[in-house]
Regions:
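Alpha-helix C-terminal capping segments
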Residues: 79-84, 113-122
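Glycine-rich phosphate/pyrophosphate-binding loops
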Residues: 117-137
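Glycine/threonine-rich flexible loop motifs
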Residues: 98-107
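Active-site metal-binding loops of divalent metal-dependent hydrolases
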Residues: 9
């Protein structure tokens, strides 16, 4: 099995090496990550200019590593179509910061697994809280065994996993709503600094990813690439006749 490991926190991520080493249990690992941090880049790709790709030193002789001076989605796109390698699975992360609710849509970490899905590849996005890398790494075996026990990859090929610090058990979740309110602070020369604050309130429904992860549960959320509202499509399909 050939595994692609990517992220949006760049080659400098402190958890990249341990994650790549952990992934070796599944097969041959290749690391293709952004040269610089790409948080908030979602599923964007570069179509107007060339970008740099370099093989870089990596502290494991079994793993080849490359940096791409572009987005996480471009890392996946280049790894598959530029390197011409037949990957079997994509792991994106471990992100520094949880990717929950609507904020998931802005995530470069999640954008990378959506790009993998565009090529029909199974993929998992992994995220944790700042300062939670060690705990997240320790939890990966538990998450792996949960996936195996319940045949999750046979039921769906795309997941978003959030591992909070001091985590409790694993919960299957669905996407929550907005839990950050944005603000923009005027700087000098018409420049604005984006900021925000949490507006999350615990509703007590722990099938929602925000509620689950922010109260300590490991959130495992099945994703879908197809954004068609099938209920509405099926209701309106007769208009085509």
């Amino acid at each position: 099995m050939r595994i692609l490991v990517t992220n949006d926190d760049s080659i400098t991520s402190e958890v990249l090496l341990p994650l790549a080493k952990w992934a070796k249990q599944f097969g041959e690992v290749t690391v293709v990550v952004p040269k610089y941090e790409q948080s908030g880049k979602s599923h964007c790709i570069e179509i107007h200019k060339a970008f740099e790709v370099k093989q870089v030193p990596f502290d494991d002789p079994d793993i080849k590593a490359y940096t791409v001076d572009s987005s996480p989605a471009d890392c996946v796109r280049y790894a598959i179509e530029g390197m011409k390698l037949d990957f079997d699975f994509v792991i994106s992360g471990i992100n520094r910061g949880l990717n929950l609710g609507i904020d998931m849509l802005y995530s470069g970490t999640v954008g990378a697994v959506f790009e993998a899905a565009c090529f029909g590849l199974p993929a998992v996005a992994l995220s944790t809280e700042p300062g939670g890398f060690d705990e997240a790494m320790d939890a990966l075996e538990e998450v792996k065994e949960f996936f195996i026990k319940h045949d999750l990859m046979k039921k769906n090929s795309l997941y978003n996993v959030n591992i909070p610090k001091n985590h409790k058990e694993i919960r299957i979740t669905r996407m929550g709503g907005r839990y950050f309110a944005d603000d923009f602070l005027l700087q000098d020369n018409d420049m604005y600094l984006p900021t925000g604050k949490s507006v999350w309130k615990d509703s007590g429904d722990y099938s929602i990813d925000t509620n689950a992860a922010l109260t300590g549960y490991i959130s495992v959320l099945p994703l879908t690439l197809n954004r068609t509202n099938m209920d509405v499509f099926q209701e309106l399909e007769n208009l085509n006749h």
